[in-house]
Amino acid sequence: MRQEATCSLVLTQDAQHRKNQPPLAEEDDDRDHTDDAMPPPCSILLRQEEGEATAAAAGEGLLVPPLNFAMVDHGVYRSGFPDISNLPFVESLRLRSVLCLCPEPYPEANQEFLRAHGIRLFQFGIDGSKEPFVNIPEDRIREALKVVLDVANHPVLIHCKRGKHRTGCVVGCLRKLQRWCLTSIFDEYQRFAAAKARVSDLRFMELFDISSLKHLPASFSC
């Protein structure tokens, strides 16, 4: 009985205390509760930080291909001139050979890279002149094609400065050896040359005589 009386007294006093409290101001009910929002749990913050760190690390190891890089066939690639930032990507191709169509001396940094990875350099300098009536040296195109046709040089990367005209002519003549129709050859050339396609290049590929070179199957992988 004494315990029940004590509990009743406590409840009565608590009720009386709340009754005597002043009412809450109305502005408390209308206040903006955005400040009361709970901060995100630590686990979420940690996951966000880990994600940002992973993305940064991935960015540092990103492989950047050279301008106009593409696979021509099994073991044959084409591109513009690889610069220093492209060398990690070039390394991933595990090349045996590089075929350069520029007449200028090959950069020392690129030569060091080739030596370090046991990659052989073939260079057949072709003038990159934009003059419409400058003849394309057919003999150098033929020598370049012989390098590409020798599977002992594969994987091989063919490149000029931009990977458009000189590289496009070599690849176009290679396609003739693979028995591509001219429409498909021209379409591939224009895909890389775009608005800078040259009529002289198209004419050269059309008239190029493949009789002295061995013909290929549809693909080097055959």
Swiss-Prot record:
Location of the active site: 160 (phosphocysteine intermediate)
Molecular-function annotations in GO: inositol-5-diphosphate-1,2,3,4,6-pentakisphosphate diphosphatase activity; phosphatase activity
PROSITE patterns: TYR_PHOSPHATASE_1, TYR_PHOSPHATASE_DUAL
Compositionally skewed regions (Polar residues) per UniProt: 1-14
Entry's induction text: Induced by 20% PEG (polyethylene glycol) 6000 (to simulate drought), ABA (abscisic acid) and NaCl.
GO cellular component: cytoplasm; nucleus
Nucleus is among the record's keywords: yes
Region (WPD loop important for active site topology): 124-136
SUPFAM superfamilies in the cross-refs: (Phosphotyrosine protein) phosphatases II
Keyword Transport recorded: no
Role description: Cleaves the beta-phosphate at the 5-position of soluble inositol pyrophosphates. Has highest activity on 5-diphosphoinositol 1,2,3,4,6-pentakisphosphate (5-InsP(7)). Possesses phosphotyrosine phosphatase activity in vitro. May contribute to regulation of drought stress responses.
Protein name: Inositol diphosphatase DSP1
Provenance organism: Oryza sativa subsp. japonica
Gene from which the chain derives: DSP1
